[in-house]
Amino acid sequence: MPVNHRFTFSYRLLFLIFLLSFETAQRLVTGDPNDEACLTNLRQSLEDPANNLRNWTKSFFINPCSGFSSYLHGVICNNGRIYKLSLTNLSLRGSISPFLSNCTNLQSLDLSSNQISGEIPPQLQFFVNLAVLNLSSNRLSGQISPQIALCAYLNVIDLHDNQLSGQIPFQFGLLARLTAFDVSNNKLSGQIPSNLAMRNGNLPRFNASSFIGNKKLFGYPLEEMKNKGLSIMAIVGIGLGSGIASLVISFTGVCIWLKITEKKMEEEEGKISHSMPVY
């Protein structure tokens, strides 16, 4: 019996389309397991006294995304995957779970203006697509992991107003796309990496405001700001010194004038007494 090759090809094509459709439908129902693990672990590591994450439940973690939207507060999706987490100013406490890195498609992470403590997990290095990292205004401590610089697409690193210590990793200066950098008001020490402070013409790559508030941090552009401060103090000192010197000279002049005047008056009195007739 002759085989109808056209029929066989059509059958195989339909079967392939069915499999792809079934797989897509299954993903839409269950979501991505990496995103589910990411959200589950992050929720377990955070405390939510204001109950802002009340809909962060397991039933939603199974399928957090519906195309480009999500029912979860602070979660933004793109093509069925989480690509942005924005949980800013929600009074959150706790720590950042290292398993947050399971959100492998994440491009923006903003946990700013909370009360999150602990260290910044080095596992954030696995966010290969991450462009924005904002963990500012929290209570994060410990050293900044240089491994975060493995996120080659980073263009924003904002860690200001925390309790971070140690040195600024020089690897951050190797991030070619980095356009915004702020580690001010921490407990950082050591010299500012030259590749973060290098000049672009007459301007530094990042100015002093990116580094201020770290008492043991030094180097350009902080040194220039300190020198300007010293110059102002010197000017004030010179002004005060000049004023005091002028007062001393004036006072001395008055004293000398009074002394001379007193002596002249005594001489005049003597002359008058000699010229008066004796009766």
Swiss-Prot record:
Extracellular side stretches: 32-228
Entry membrane topology: Single-pass type I membrane protein
Main location: membrane
GO cellular component: plasma membrane
Gene3D superfamilies: Ribonuclease Inhibitor
Glycosylated position list: 55, 89, 102, 134, 207
Transmembrane annotation, as ranges: 229-249
Ranges in the topological domain labelled Cytoplasmic: 250-279
InterPro entries in the cross-refs: Leu-rich_rpt, Leu-rich_rpt_4, LRR_dom_sf, LRR_N_plant-typ
Subcellular location: Cell membrane
UniProt LRR repeat ranges: 103-129, 131-151, 152-174, 175-200
Signal peptide: 1-31
Family designation: Belongs to the RLP family.
Entry protein name: Receptor-like protein 57
Organism per entry: Arabidopsis thaliana
Gene name of this polypeptide: RLP57
